[in-house]
Amino acid sequence: MALADKRLENLQIYRVLQCVRNKDKKQIEKLTRLGYPELINFTEPIDGLSALHLASISNDTDMVSFLLKLGAHPDVQDHMGCTPTMRAAELGHELSMEILAKAKADMTIVDNEGKGVLFYCILPTKRHYRCSLIALEHGADVNNITYEGKPVFLRACEEAHDVKDMCLTFLEKGANPNAINTSTGRTALMESSREGVLEIVRGILERGGEVNAYDNDRHHAAHFAAKGGFFDILKLLFAYNGDMGLIGMDGNTPLHFAAMGGFADCCKYIAQRGCDLKWKNLEHKTPRVVAKDGGFKAASKEIRRAERTAAKLAKTGAKNPNPLWALRLHDWSIEHETSLRNAFKFVDRGDGVVSKDDFVVALEERQEYATSEQLLSVAQMHEKSRGGGVNINEFFKGTKYLSKSYVLGSFGPKKKKRGLGKKPRKGKFVLPLPICTIPENAFPRRPDGGPPYYMIETYQNVSDSHRFNRDHPPEHPIQDDSEWYIDDPSRVFANISFITKAGDLASLKKAIETGIPVDMKDNTYKTPLMIACASGNIDVVKFLIEKGANVNATDNFLWTPLHFACHAGQQDIVELLVKAGASIDATSINNSTPLSRAIESCRLDTVKYLLDMGAKFQIENRKGHAAMDIAKAYADYRIIDMIKEKLDNLPKQADNQKMKGKLPKLKTEGTDVKKEEETLSSIYTVPAITEEKKVHRDSVVYLNSLITSGFTKKVDITFIPKRIWSPEATTAELIRKRELRRERFTYEVDFEDFMMPFQKNITEKAQALEATLKN
């Protein structure tokens, strides 16, 4: 079509495009009538878009119909060679595409890369599938090939898992089952096998797809199916005369790929169906070595078993009881069981048995893998007596002419045998660790039947968002009259721990003002101060300490807030808690101190601060490990040197003191147990909730007191607003808060995979250990 290259033409086409966006039909009609001839089909000079392109992209069916009536051509192409139909198909606009198809849009046009409209329909939505149906109904080429040599059917098979119905439709409409990408050598069968879609693989093979074609790397469909562990596809490929022993350019057979993934059933099947078990790839590894290197014991065991069988058959005079033609006949008969049973019905004697001759004739007409002599030998194996015939059910089982481990029924999960047998050996008793939660009945309920008190009401700053926001709050309570025309929102309750972790100070302040204790424990025994210390939220920690939170409160594991702060590696919070009176040597249920938690997190500054504040580093936990033992276990040499220096600075014992015996331990077992029992018993107590006493305003005593106090003579002109705007952090303050978080937690805090110091330390050491073991 005409390309606008002059200034006036540019202005007019841009004006038309703007009118299309604004849906100004009158102006479009006027420009078409008074402007340049064929202006409706002009394209803008940058992307080459016409008016019909824009209408199709926005799925404005009314505008598409209007433009077509004005003479817009449905096949105008942009700079990429795309028509409005292609643009509509790409976005799944089926309504616009249907209108364009009725306007006789040419569905065989290709873009600058040789892609037809069907290429733009290959996306995993129902709308794109319906667009492909519209294109096929109006003459789209199902065998369209790009200039690089990629057919549209092969492109769909690359996404077969998501567009299965579309691929099957392409096959039904006559797509070439042997579609091949000339640049890579990949076929549609290879791509559908790689995706693991059995229905498409079956459809391609039924329509004559070449099963043993291979790509530029000499990989064929069995390689891709084995790599993904698709056992059903491997069975299907072998049933259609697939070669399980083809060797790729990298020296890998399908068995190598199955061993790489540890697919035991696939390894067993491929090993039985003619693959070379001793073949080495370019890395000089056999399939069994590949499975062993990957740590797949089951796959390695199956390959080893097949190697033993192959070694026995390699001896002179040994006869193979499971020849390849018999295995292929068995797999083919299972794949075509329905059609074979229908064929055998016509010659059935009435008891599920057919004569030997009829059996041979029926199979000889339908397959070419076994000769008539071989089929006759199979029939004779099924005959119990001369002229007894072949039982159809036994033939499909395959156990009469194949070993039991070679038939398809031997694959898959084994069924448990019923009956008496040996009792299984009892394993070592493991005490189950219960999930420690406070019972719901231990929490007092609200008088109005609401949730437990650890579920607090969230604060909602309800106001007219069109007038006020966090950067432009109301200057005076009288200015904000939103309460008079905005409905009150419904009450929303959230766990106090979630509120604390999110740093919602407004909701916490509201809860404390309404009588919720500042040390209210949630159903996992954690107080808000513990949660704030664990998440590293110093603002919430300061707020809770100001409100009188207990800095020595314990959970069910006797962890204090200082334990959580040291475990999270938050130096500033540790200092804040110690200044507020936190016990620096508080022991948990396994006698671990906050110093132990700081060492586990490998936080040198926190460890140094605790030692400078007088933390006892000789205290041992239940396992008898002191601070030095824990530091060695977590392999932080900086902390080891620091503790060693402290140990060296301890005063040495005199000789006469050594003769008196060992020094008394810093802890005694009896007092420790007693302390634990007392602490554990107090864990289950939930703080009492103080209810406000409601004054009965209709009481005679109350009204009489008002009269005597002269309240009725006073004129109160105080204005009390219904709702007061709660100060919110401005955008600048939120940005500054994010900057501070990055300074405290590093830049990684903005990513989803951010980990606190302890978790990060453990993960890094585990990954390093895993890498060492692999090498």
Curated annotation (Swiss-Prot):
Coiled-coil ranges per UniProt: none
Could you tell me the superkingdom of the organism this chain comes from? Answer: Eukaryota
Which InterPro entries does the UniProt record give?
Answer: Ankyrin-EF-hand, Ankyrin_rpt, Ankyrin_rpt-contain_sf, EF-hand-dom_pair
Keyword hit for Repeat: yes
| Signal peptide (from-to) | none
Under the heading Pfam families, the entry gives: Ank_2
ANK repeat boundaries on the chain: 47-76, 184-213, 217-246, 250-279, 524-553, 557-586, 590-619, 623-652
**Keyword field:** ANK repeat, Repeat
* Name by which UniProt lists this protein: Ankyrin repeat and EF-hand domain-containing protein 1
The gene is Ankef1
